[in-house]
Amino acid sequence: MGKPTLPPVVVVVVLLLLVVVLPATTCGADAGGGGEAEEFQIPRDGRVLELDDGNFDAAVRAAGLLFVDFYAPWCGHCKRLAPQLDEAAPVLAGLSTPIVVAKVNADKYKKLGSKYGVDGFPTLMLFDHGTPTEYTGSRKADLLVENLKKLVAPDVSVLESDSAIKSFVEDAGMGFPLFLGFGVDESLIVEYGAKYKNRAWFSVAKDFSEDMMVFYDFDKVPALVSVNPKYREQSIFYGPFDDGAFLEDFIRNSLLPLVVPMNRETVKMLNDDGRKVVLMILQDDESDENSPRLIKVLRSAASANRDLVFGYVGVNQWEEFTETFDVKSSELPTMIVWDKKEEYEIVEGSERLEEGDYGSQISRFLEGYRAGRTIKKKVGDRSPTLLGVNAVYILVFLVAVLVLLMYFSGQGEEDQRPRQRAHED
């Protein structure tokens, strides 16, 4: 006998029941039987939350601002980041506009990571009322707090009183330059507030007293005051405000200190600045007794030559950077003009700054540069006397690369893991 079969009509009825009943059952389970998604409770103690694919969406809805670390347990960079997030989380939770910090094991919850384009660890994202933006700034706790405060702030803050101005400056902290527009219409700077949002604070003061005019040292309005609290610098722009080129030049120039101390963080800040860099290279920019005097003279030159960026660096402080300019200790202190890419120029007759009248020597250097009396060199070039040594270094490097390639070619599971995201603060 053949196996009994169901009539076609019965099959159709069963399928219809499955289509109608199963979705309703599933929704009821997700909603806890009440027909509504369970509300996520944000803890008030400022700890880092551990989220998963079951509560992530609810957490995004509950927290207006949610900063998420998509991590993997085996990732070394993630392990080093964890204590920084633990330190930053209570500070961010205590802001006037709180930011909740959370983490997700994206190696375990791969679909959740894939949904937000996570292809390496750690991946950091800020969810602003549900809208994700990848964060690529510093991962040190204090700088992380400053950067996130800046990201969630309005492009231009409107201040209605002296107390509001003081609170704005205090809340901004020391991490970024500030622009305070006294008697300046918001519409005149809102474009730049958006354009340079990640690099400075912008505000307009609609009501203020004469005390503010005295404190910020301006005597008429409209006036745009630039304050760089980290370097204790201040400058004032009185206009013209109807010419965007002049206004943006002032803003762009004020994003950097008058003389930039070169380090890994400040070099990154130069990327968006189109000016070349007049770089003074010292043996030691901290302990050398002549360094303060040299930097003071360099500051005077910088204020008179705003079409150039001026900076200084000590060999003892950052040898890896200074050696790319092929300078010798016997030639220090020296000056070059660097294009921030592949070339730099030395000025003929100004190869070394001799002790004495530094002001005149720096003036002659700038005159020689503007007159074109320069020799162009490639960044990373070495003198002929170092070719033999470099050849040895290159050989050692190639052997090391070969060994690494052989090692990683034998890895199985490890190669299948998403890459770790290195980040240099």
Swiss-Prot record:
User: According to Swiss-Prot or TrEMBL, what is its membrane topology?
Assistant: Single-pass membrane protein
**Which residue numbers mark the site Contributes to redox potential value?**
76-77
Q: Where is this site: Lowers pKa of C-terminal Cys of active site?
A: 139
Q: Pfam families recorded for this chain?
A: Thioredoxin (PF00085), Thioredoxin_6 (PF13848)
A GO CC annotation recorded here is: membrane
Which InterPro entries does its entry note?
Thioredoxin-like_sf, Thioredoxin_CS, Thioredoxin_domain
- Parts of the chain that traverse the membrane: 386-406
Name the record gives this protein = Protein disulfide isomerase-like 5-3
Higher taxonomy: Eukaryota, Viridiplantae, Streptophyta, Embryophyta, Tracheophyta
